[in-house]
Swiss-Prot record:
This is Ataxin-10 homolog. May play a role in the regulation of cytokinesis. GO terms for cellular component: cytosol. The lineage of its organism: Eukaryota, Fungi, Dikarya, Ascomycota, Saccharomycotina. GO terms for biological process: cell division. SUPFAM superfamilies: ARM repeat (SSF48371). Keywords: Cell cycle, Cell division, Cytoplasm. The gene is CTR86.
Amino acid sequence: MSEKKKILQDIDRLLSEANSDPQLYHDNLGLLNDFVIETANNTAIRDKFSRDKETWQLIKTILVNSHVEDISGWSAEVIFLYKRLLRGVFILARNLAVSGSEIAQELLLQNIAYKIFNNSLKVGKLDDGMQLALYSTILSFLHNMSSKSVVFDRSSSKELFEFLHFPVKLNYEYTKDILLPYLLYFKDLIQHDDFLYYFLRYDKVDSILCGLILDKIMRDESQIFEIVSGTRIVSPDVNLSDIDMILLRTFALISTHESFIPYLEDKENNSFNIFIDLLKLMQLVVTNIDSWDKFQLTSIMTWTYKIFEKNADQIKNYFKNKLENEEIAKKLHAKCVITLDIMAKLCQFNHVQKFIISYKGLDQLISLLNIFQDNLIRVNFTKTSQASDITGVKATNKLGEKLAKDSLIEERIDLINMKIKETNFPECKLLIIEIIAMLTHENREIQNQVRELGGLGVILSNCVIDDNDPFIKERSIMCIKFLLKDNKENQNFVANLESKRVANDETLQEAGYEVDISKDGKLSLKSTNQ
């Protein structure tokens, strides 16, 4: 037997017999330290032992035979040394797992690691330095072990979830050094479908996912919370940290899992603030990733469209009952903008366009657009020549008729700060028209459906400047271009509206068309580009 393996055997004997002589621990720590340094600095030695099953079996034997939970009556010095020696074994395993993760997985060392750490909590303080160092080392070992594939053993899920729950028990100030290895391993785990299925049903999932990761790590250690809350803009100049990137990848994986749907529904019904924070986070994730496969797109659209459809019905009832309630409108508006923004981003994929059409999403979009058209006021702020200070406001109804300064204007606009309230659902019409434009592009069938569903006229009506929906004029004109292209029925429909002065000549010109009167007096549109 090699000298190195004898070191491991001696450590096994010491830990299993639970000897309380401090000098024995110091002697073994010195020998183990040399072995650890060699595996860290010498690739050949590391590769040799990482592929050796006997070495891994010795490590497993040490871990299985250790009884850290039985040393509570010992002196603080020996408890410290026992945990330190145990940590040294995990450091060695961490180094070897870089090249030998397959053998470690075969031996199910992750299950043993969870159990050992959970048992170690029975001895000493939660926040002592060695306890935290042991946790961080085990996390790094588990991450290295999961580099090629992730193993999730359902029979050890209770031990695993208890292991993951450890940082929640600490004062947050003590968790700083474990955050990165914790997030790395957590990201590894959620790549396993079964883990995420059971984790999202774990009774303490909120304390980990929302309390620790979303509320503490994301708020205090990441820029993501600032981006989600709107105090920081995503731009090429923003350098995302390692923690930022891990968090985004983590929630990208969560967003595409089937178990996320019932979890979101539960948060909407029981913890609305958490629900909105999650939804805003998913909005950030989805709108900043350009590569999704069809399965992932279907998963995202399933929960997005479900929330949108339910919320659209609630918005219709809100206006039907003339509620004018700022608290209710704030919730409805947030869900509406987020889901529409996600759909607008994902509409670049043909798969998502087909999804929306197959679920009669076009009907729902046009119906909601008409509700907004009938109930929202159009807002135009008067600004200084520098376009910075707002000096006044003009509000009109859907017909362009100026509204007097009555209670409706005060319900929809904060006249003191000159800001539009959520009660006027800002940016919702804009996003709907953007989605319709993408669905309509070079699709004759959808062009016709938009007309038949009553969408063509209302889109024409939005080819105007409206501060409630910035750039809605430009988006509407683009949508009209797509609706009229090579579509005689739509062109005749718009020509008829123009004859009644419902359509605007300037709008048609910007869309690339003009009214043509034939010799027999019939109106039609012709392209100005011909």
